[in-house]
């Protein structure tokens, strides 16, 4: 292109210019026509706007519209109400649905329970049917057995008859046989027989031991195998589950690993794609940069062509002006500018008339030239070593054109060269780039220097004539370089990022240093001369006719021009070949700022051109016009100087900037205060109304621009200037007047002050630095017009300085809270800032794309259109871009401002929350002590109310009302105190804190009130909960005592007082010390009347207490830490008190029992003398203690025979009457809801023993001895019998149970008194003081010392089993001595029954008791005392064996048979007792039936008696003995077979039914206990069935073996061993048959009582005898050893139960629940098992 331009001659170009001018003329005329049309349209629009008639329709419809709005509001309100109603109905429907679901679920549960009950009923029915069938079978078996028995008996009688004949024949033998030899043989045979028996016994014992050991080992092995099998199964399941889990985890791990691999591959592919895209984009960018560079070169060449066209156009301007002067088609743009500058000061018209719009086309061209001039200066300082220094062909071409124009008399200043360029910083900023460069002064100077002084002088002579021409020329000279600069700047701006290897920061610094050095050197020459030169330079393009400017031109030396030309040439050449790389953000910012300033220049130019017609006033208004133009130019220069400020991390650069600006300001300018500026502006406003309007419009536009620029700056430079903050703080801000910036930018400082609040003063310092930098242009203007106010400047500066300090102080105060907030920057805010940066980057890309489109459009328009058309379209495009960019800037600013506000709110929220916590903690600490005091008062009042409630049981509602009222009063008090505490807490805070909370919208009073209220309510409820816990624990303590609600007594009344613990301690001491006196009996009748009232009070109290607890539980309990600790401490204290009371009771009972054992040891020494004391009555004192006093002495044996028949008949009649009464009472009680164990005392009828029936001392002696022996046999448990009822009383397992025997002989005590006093026997912990009775308890393992003492005392009258073989003679003697005592005690036995029956009903049972029916036992077979503690199988102590003459015995039995027949019918009544009552049926197995507890050593007492008699008469009475033995055997067999009338529930197929409702531990315990009973009482007709068949066989075997041993040991010394062995075999057969039948039919259950008839028992006995004809069933040989091995385990379980009993740790069981449990046989208070027997068994005894 350059070569083409060089080849084309100037003549051809002239021809082309003429044709172009013609086209331009047509274009301008078209523009004029369009302007006229626009003016008409504008007037029409104005007229339409002025008319207000069209708006009247609003008033017409306003009222209607308001009505409609009201109707709409009403409809909306109704809709809201309907929605509320709908929501409430929906909630109600949901509630009803929930209730329906609950009811449905309850119905389903009821159906399930009904089905289960039906199933249970069917099972019970089937069981009953089976039992009936079984009963029939057993009856048939019993008949068979009886038939076989008759046959066997006949055979035995025949054998006995034959044997007696043989004996008679043997006695008649010849005398040849010597008696001595016979005796020797008999003795030898007996020895041989004895040795064989001993050897057999030893072998059997060894085999039994081995077998038992083997069975035990087998059992253990089986158990271990079972456990191991279960363990193996559990481990297998666990292994399977672990394997499955392992597989699942492995699958999950593999899946996650695969997903991770896939994700990594996906990310790798994405990274590769992005890398490839990056490479592609780099290539595309390189191509685009290269294209842009080429376009830049093309643009430069085109700009040269346009310059050429402009010069030609100027040459023809004179002709065009003269030809078309009348129509003003072509007006001189220079003259227009001059007119505009004058118009700026005059401005007599607000709007430009239509006549003056003909120059719009040239004005528009001039505007575009002005817009295009300075943009290239932004990049002019960039240099590169690759650019050649030689002169380019373009420069040569311009030189040629310049020479041509000079020859024609026109001065063309210079080719468009790039002079000094202000660079744009690489930092993120929106303010660095402005269109006008900082070298405006030098450019004006260069242009002025190139003017010929001589020509100017000549033109000065004809100033008025030549002003327009010369002004036009000079304007063109200024505009041409500007246009070229603009074109070059566009091309450079589009391609500047192509050279990344050049550091823009370094180039910018270099250019800035050169610029500053040149400016400073220019003004250092002299202040006055420089000011005049600058004014001349600025004024020259406007009015050349000014003589001052001509003089200034003459003063300028032409040498500077020559020096500046080479430099400018080099700079222009370097710019033409070089680009600068900037970041994408800077490119977008550059385009925005450039368009903004172009818009301002356009507005200013339009304003200037509007004054074109005021040329005749140019001279007069020059002084007023020139300062305004200079003001505007200097404003633009200040913007350029702002651009030159480079924020960077390099402190040296900042020092260079500050240093250069400070020197520049100090040497050349004087600071001006705000007052001066206001006076100056007022002066300008007073000039004219039009000038004021123009200035306001100009400043308004400028302020809008500055606001947008400042907003951009605040968004982009906030983080960049932090690094330079410390350095910028060192700048002397006070020496500069910041109001000059306010004058030019009236809104900038306000915005900066607002930003200072959020940015900690950074932007204030930044703005200050900018003010320092911009002083050069602003103060240059103000210094010319404020020289008359210089005296006021220093004062105004001081005043302004003080004002700024106060403002900064206020800003600092106001920014205290934001500073605190800014310190707590969270991660979310950082992420938010990062997202903002990303959005800004995206916006920058979009702006860059818009700029590229603009550049492309500009290039296309440049190629296709002429110069004038290109300028016009470019200007319009720039205006549109400017509008779009300004809108985008405003949007960005609003978004950033909103984000800043959000972040500030978040920070304030965080700080507010922290302060809230501090406030709450502080208020809590202030009010905690007062709250504690109030809560203590509340606690005391609540305790008082509770005590008051306990004193008034019958008024249930009054305590609740009082308590609720007190609680409400306390709540009101607490609310008042909370308010006071809140006020005090608020006073402790500073005023700033309260204001801060109030400003942030938090109600501190409400927060504190809610917090303290919650704490107070929590502590209040905590205290009430503690009181409730205390009450519940006290109730548990009361109910843990095994006394019923009907027999609470004075103890519970004392527990209701506040001094419960002290009185409880005294009461526990009284339990061991108080002894009941007979004279106190009268008080007990009154106490029984008080008992019913007390029961009602207890019920009322429980209801009242429950209501109080419910009242306290209504509110939510929020426990404070201190309250939790307090409640725990209270509970611990209560537990300690309870444990102390229990320990005191136990220690007291231990002491009492030790004394009892010592006393008993002394009394046992008098056994041989028949002096024994017995407890014949038990009474209850004020504390419920038991005490019996009966001192009876034995004088002889003669009176026994006289009294026994009479006493027996009387007692039998009395007992028969009692049985009827008992049946009636039991049937009546069965109709009630429930009857508890302790309430059965009411069933006992009162029977008095009249004076005629008083017991004689001798009879009492036998009775006492009998009772003592019974007590021994029962391990310390008293056995009380009637004739037809036998009760088994089981006292507590603690050693508190005893009976006290005093030495007051002959004490008479009636049964009536006994029954009255025994009603209060309710607490098992109360003791029966029995100092002289031997007993054993399975109670507490802690009382072993007492038990050992008891055992030692028991060794005195009894011999252990181990030594029985050695001490047979002594044992036999003791047995003979006790025979008469045992028989005589039968007569007085019935008297015991009435007393003991009542005692049994009042004492709860803990361990199962055996039956007390058997009459016979051998003392020699008593187990060892040590074994009695270890094995309950051996726990029974044998009774004394009695023996009288056979005649006496027959008489006694005949009387008994009569009584049996009279009482036969009563047996059925006893068996028909309802299940719901606690049934007690007894049996009496003989006239003088003696309670005995037979263990494994059971045998017939009759056989033992006969053995003892035979032992006394070994040689004379053998025949009589055999006859009596046979008769006795028949009676024994019949008696033992038929006595089995008990309530049983036998299931052969389900032997373990007994324990189905028990847990594992209880099951084992109860099974073992049932086994014990079966072993101990096999000859009795009531006992529990074993847990399995093996145990039954073992029990039977043990009994047979023990009987064999006992019989053998009794008959060892008889002379005729054969006859004795035969009798023993018969007895073994009978006993084993009876034992087996008893074992098979025994079944006692905890689930209820099923009654079977006597026939069932008989059938069972017959069936058993058939199965085991030999009398010794298999599998019974090793039961004793096995039972002994199981003994420790059973004892341990028994101790555990007893310990629970002693400690009172029992669950609270209601009346109904306790009754139901008792009926099921497993009550939680541990009552003993009640077995039903009957007197009817005696009837079967006499059938044979």
Curated annotation (Swiss-Prot):
Organism encoding this protein: Xenopus laevis
Residue ranges occupied by any IF rod domain in the UniProt entry: 13-320
Annotated stretches, region: Coil 1A: 8-48
Organism placement in taxonomy: Eukaryota, Metazoa, Chordata, Craniata, Vertebrata
Identification of the protein by name: Tanabin
Amino acid composition bias (Polar residues), ranges on this chain: 980-990, 1433-1442, 1576-1586, 1597-1621, 1629-1639
Keyword terms of this UniProt record: Coiled coil, Intermediate filament
Record's compositionally biased regions (Basic and acidic residues): 341-371, 785-815, 1074-1086, 1352-1367, 1386-1398, 1423-1432, 1445-1460, 1698-1709
Annotated segments matching region Disordered: 341-372, 785-816, 976-996, 1032-1093, 1340-1470, 1485-1506, 1560-1722
């Amino acid at each position: 292109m350059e070569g083409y331009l060089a080849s084309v001659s100037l003549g051809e170009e002239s021809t082309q210019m003429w044709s172009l001018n013609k086209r331009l003329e047509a274009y301008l005329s078209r523009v004029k026509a369009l302007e006229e049309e626009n003016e008409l349209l504008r007037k029409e629009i104005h007229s339409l706007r002025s008319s207000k008639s069209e708006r009247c329709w609003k008033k017409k419809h306003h009222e209607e519209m308001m009505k409609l709005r009201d109707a709409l509001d009403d409809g909306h309100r109704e809709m809201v109400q309907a929605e509320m109603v709908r929501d409430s109905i929906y909630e109600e429907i949901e509630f009803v649905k929930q209730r329906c679901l609950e009811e449905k679920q309850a119905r389903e549960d009821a159906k399930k329970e009904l089905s289960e009950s039906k199933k249970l009923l069917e099972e019970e029915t089937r069981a009953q049917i089976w039992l009936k069938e079984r009963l029939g079978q057993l009856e048939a078996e019993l008949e068979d057995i009886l038939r076989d028995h008759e046959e066997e008996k006949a055979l035995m009688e025949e054998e006995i008859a034959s044997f007696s004949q043989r004996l008679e024949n043997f006695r008649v033998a010849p005398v040849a046989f010597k008696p001595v030899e016979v005796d020797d043989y008999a003795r030898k045979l007996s020895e041989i027989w004895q040795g064989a028996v001993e050897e057999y016994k030893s072998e059997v014992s060894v085999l039994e031991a081995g077998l038992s050991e083997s069975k035990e080992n087998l059992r253990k092995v089986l158990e271990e195998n079972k456990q191991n099998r279960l363990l193996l199964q559990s481990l297998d399941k666990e292994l399977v589950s672990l394997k499955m889990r392992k597989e699942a985890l492995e699958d999950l791990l593999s899946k996650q690993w695969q997903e991770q691999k896939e994700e990594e591959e996906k990310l790798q592919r994405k990274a590769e794609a992005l890398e490839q895209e990056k490479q592609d984009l780099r290539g595309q960018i390189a191509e685009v940069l290269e294209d842009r560079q080429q376009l830049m070169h093309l643009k430069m060449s085109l700009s040269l062509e346009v310059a050429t066209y402009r010069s030609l156009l100027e040459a023809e301007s004179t002709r065009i002006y003269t030809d078309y002067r009348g129509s003003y088609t072509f007006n001189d743009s220079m003259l227009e500018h001059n007119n505009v500058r004058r118009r700026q000061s005059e401005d007599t018209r607000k709007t430009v008339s239509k006549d003056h719009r003909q120059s719009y086309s040239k004005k528009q061209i001039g505007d575009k030239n002005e817009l295009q001039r300075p943009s290239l200066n932004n990049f002019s300082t960039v240099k590169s070593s690759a650019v050649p220094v030689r002169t380019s062909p373009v420069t040569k071409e311009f030189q040629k054109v310049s020479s041509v124009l000079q020859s024609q008399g026109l001065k063309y200043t210079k080719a468009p060269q790039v002079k000094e360029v202000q660079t744009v910083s690489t930092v993120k900023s929106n303010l660095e780039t402005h269109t006008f460069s900082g070298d405006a002064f030098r450019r004006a100077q260069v242009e002025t220097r190139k003017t010929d002084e001589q020509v100017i002088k000549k033109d000065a002579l004809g100033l008025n004539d030549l002003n327009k021409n010369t002004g036009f020329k000079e304007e063109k000279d200024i505009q041409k370089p500007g246009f070229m600069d603009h074109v070059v700047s566009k091309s450079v701006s589009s391609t500047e990022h192509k050279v990344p290897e050049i550091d823009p920061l370094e180039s910018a610094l270099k250019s800035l240093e050169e610029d500053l050095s040149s400016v400073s050197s220019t003004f250092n020459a002299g202040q006055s001369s420089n000011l005049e030169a600058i004014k001349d330079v600025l004024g020259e393009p406007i009015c050349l006719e000014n003589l001052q400017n001509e003089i200034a031109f003459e003063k300028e030396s032409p040498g500077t021009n020559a020096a500046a030309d080479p430099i400018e040439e080099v700079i222009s050449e370097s710019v033409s070949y070089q680009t600068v790389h900037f970041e994408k953000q800077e490119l977008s910012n550059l385009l925005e700022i450039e368009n903004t300033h172009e818009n301002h220049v356009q507005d200013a130019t339009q304003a200037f051109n509007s004054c074109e017609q005021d040329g005749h006033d140019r001279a007069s208004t020059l002084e007023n016009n020139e300062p305004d133009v200079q003001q505007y130019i200097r404003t633009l220069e200040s913007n350029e100087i702002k651009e030159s400020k480079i924020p960077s991390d390099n402190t040296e650069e900042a020092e260079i900037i500050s240093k250069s600006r400070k020197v520049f300001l100090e040497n050349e300018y004087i600071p001006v205060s705000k007052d001066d500026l206001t006076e100056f502006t007022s002066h300008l406003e007073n000039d004219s109304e039009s000038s004021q309007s123009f200035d306001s419009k100009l400043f308004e536009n400028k302020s809008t621009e500055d606001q947008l620029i400042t907003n951009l700056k605040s968004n982009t430079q906030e983080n960049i200037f932090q690094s330079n903050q410390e350095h910028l703080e060192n700048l002397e801000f006070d020496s500069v007047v910041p109001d000059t910036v306010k004058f030019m930018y009236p809104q900038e400082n306000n915005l900066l002050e607002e930003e200072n609040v959020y940015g900690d003063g950074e932007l204030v310092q930044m703005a200050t630095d900018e003010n320092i930098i911009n002083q050069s242009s602003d103060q240059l203007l103000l210094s010319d017009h404020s020289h008359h106010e210089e005296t006021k400047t220093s004062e105004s500066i001081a005043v302004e300085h003080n004002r700024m300090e106060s403002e900064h102080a206020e800003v600092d105060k106001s920014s205290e809270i934001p500073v605190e907030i800014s310190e707590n920057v969270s991660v979310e805010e950082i992420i938010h800032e990062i997202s903002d940066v990303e959005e800004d980057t995206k916006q920058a890309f979009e702006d860059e794309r818009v700029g590229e489109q603009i550049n492309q459009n500009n290039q296309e328009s440049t190629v296709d259109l002429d110069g004038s058309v290109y300028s016009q379209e470019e200007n319009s495009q720039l205006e549109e871009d400017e509008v779009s960019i300004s809108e985008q800037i405003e949007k960005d600013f609003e978004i950033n401002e909103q984000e800043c506000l959000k972040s500030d709110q978040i920070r304030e929220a965080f700080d507010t929350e922290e302060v809230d916590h501090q406030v709450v903690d502080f208020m809590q600490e202030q009010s905690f002590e007062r709250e504690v005091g109030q809560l203590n008062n509340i606690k005391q009042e609540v305790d008082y109310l509770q005590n008051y409630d306990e004193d008034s049981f019958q008024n249930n509602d009054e305590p609740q009302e009082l308590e609720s009222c007190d609680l409400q009063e306390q709540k009101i008090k607490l609310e008042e105190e909370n308010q006071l505490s809140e006020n005090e807490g608020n006073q402790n805070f500073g005023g700033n804190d309260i204001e801060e909370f109030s400003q942030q919208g938090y109600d501190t009073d409400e927060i504190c009130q809610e917090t303290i209220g919650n704490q107070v309510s929590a502590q209040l409820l905590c205290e009430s909960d503690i009181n409730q816990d205390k009450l519940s624990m006290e109730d548990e303590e009361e109910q843990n005592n095994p006394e019923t609600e009907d027999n609470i007594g004075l103890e519970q009344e004392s527990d209701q007082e506040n001094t419960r613990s002290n009185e409880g301690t005294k009461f526990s001491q009284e339990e061991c010390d108080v002894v009941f006196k007979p004279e106190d009996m009268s008080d007990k009748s009154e106490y029984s009347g008080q008992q019913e009232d007390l029961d009602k009070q207890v019920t009322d109290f429980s209801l009242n207490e429950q209501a109080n607890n419910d009242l306290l539980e209504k509110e939510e309990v929020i426990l404070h830490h201190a309250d939790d600790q307090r409640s725990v401490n209270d509970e611990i204290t209560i537990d300690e008190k309870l444990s102390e009371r229990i320990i005191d009771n136990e220690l007291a009972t231990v002491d009492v029992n030790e004394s009892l054992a010592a006393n008993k040891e002394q009394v046992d020494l008098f056994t041989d003398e028949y002096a024994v004391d017995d407890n014949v009555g038990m009474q209850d004192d004020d504390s419920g203690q038991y005490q019996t006093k009966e001192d009876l002495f034995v004088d002889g044996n003669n009176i026994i025979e006289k009294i026994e028949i009479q006493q027996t008949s009387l007692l039998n009649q009395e007992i028969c009457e009692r049985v009827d009464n008992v049946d009636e009472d039991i049937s009546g009680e069965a109709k009630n809801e429930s009857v508890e164990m302790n309430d059965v005392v009411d069933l006992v009828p009162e029977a008095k023993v009249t004076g005629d029936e008083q017991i004689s001392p001798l009879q009492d002696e036998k009775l006492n001895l009998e009772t003592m022996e019974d007590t021994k046999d029962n391990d310390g448990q008293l056995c009380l019998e009637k004739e037809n009822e036998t009760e088994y009383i089981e006292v507590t397992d603690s050693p508190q149970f005893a009976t006290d025997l005093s030495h007051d002989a002959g004490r008479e005590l009636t049964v009536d008194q006994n029954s009255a006093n025994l009603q209060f026997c309710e607490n098992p912990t109360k003791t029966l003081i029995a100092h002289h009775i031997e007993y054993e308890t399975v109670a507490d393992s802690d009382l072993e010392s007492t038990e050992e003492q008891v055992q030692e005392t028991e060794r005195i009258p009894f011999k252990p089993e181990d030594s029985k073989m050695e001490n047979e003679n002594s044992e036999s003697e003791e047995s003979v001595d006790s025979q008469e005592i045992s028989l005589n005690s039968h007569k007085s036995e019935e008297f015991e029954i009435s007393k003991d029956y009542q005692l049994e009903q009042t004492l709860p049972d803990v361990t199962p008791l055996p039956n007390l029916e058997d009459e016979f036992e051998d003392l020699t077979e008593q187990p060892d005392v040590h074994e009695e503690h270890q094995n309950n199988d051996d726990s029974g102590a044998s009774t004394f064996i009695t023996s009288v003459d056979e005649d006496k015995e027959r008489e006694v039995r005949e009387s008994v048979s009569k009584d049996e027949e009279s009482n036969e019918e009563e047996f059925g009544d006893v068996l028909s007792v309802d299940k719901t009552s606690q049934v007690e049926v007894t049996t009496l197995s003989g006239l003088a039936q003696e309670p005995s507890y037979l263990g494994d050593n059971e045998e017939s007492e009759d056989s033992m008696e006969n053995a003892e008699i035979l032992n006394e008469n070994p040689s004379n009475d053998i025949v009589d003995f055999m006859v009596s033995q046979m008769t006795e055997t028949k009676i024994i067999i019949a008696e033992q077979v038929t006595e089995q009338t008990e309530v049983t529930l036998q299931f052969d197929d389900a032997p373990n039914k007994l324990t189905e409702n028990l847990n594992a531990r209880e099951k084992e315990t109860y099974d073992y206990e049932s086994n014990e009973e079966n072993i101990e009482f096999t000859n009795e007709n009531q006992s529990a069935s074993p847990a399995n068949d093996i145990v039954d066989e073992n029990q039977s075997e043990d009994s047979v073996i023990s009987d064999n041993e006992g019989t053998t040991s009794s008959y060892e010394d008889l002379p005729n061993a054969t006859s004795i062995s035969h009798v023993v075999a018969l007895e073994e057969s009978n006993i084993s048959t009876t034992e087996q039948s008893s074992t098979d039919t025994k079944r006692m259950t905890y689930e209820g009582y099923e009654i079977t008839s006597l026939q069932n028992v008989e059938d069972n006995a017959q069936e058993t005898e058939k199965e085991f004809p030999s009398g010794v069933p298999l599998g019974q040989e090793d039961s004793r050893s096995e039972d002994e091995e199981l003994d420790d385990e059973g004892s341990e379980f028994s101790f555990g139960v007893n310990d629970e009993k002693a400690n009172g740790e029992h669950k609270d069981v209601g009346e109904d629940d306790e009754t139901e449990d008792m009926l099921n046989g497993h009550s939680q208070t541990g009552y003993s098992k009640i077995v039903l027997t009957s007197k009817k068994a005696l009837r079967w005894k006499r059938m044979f």
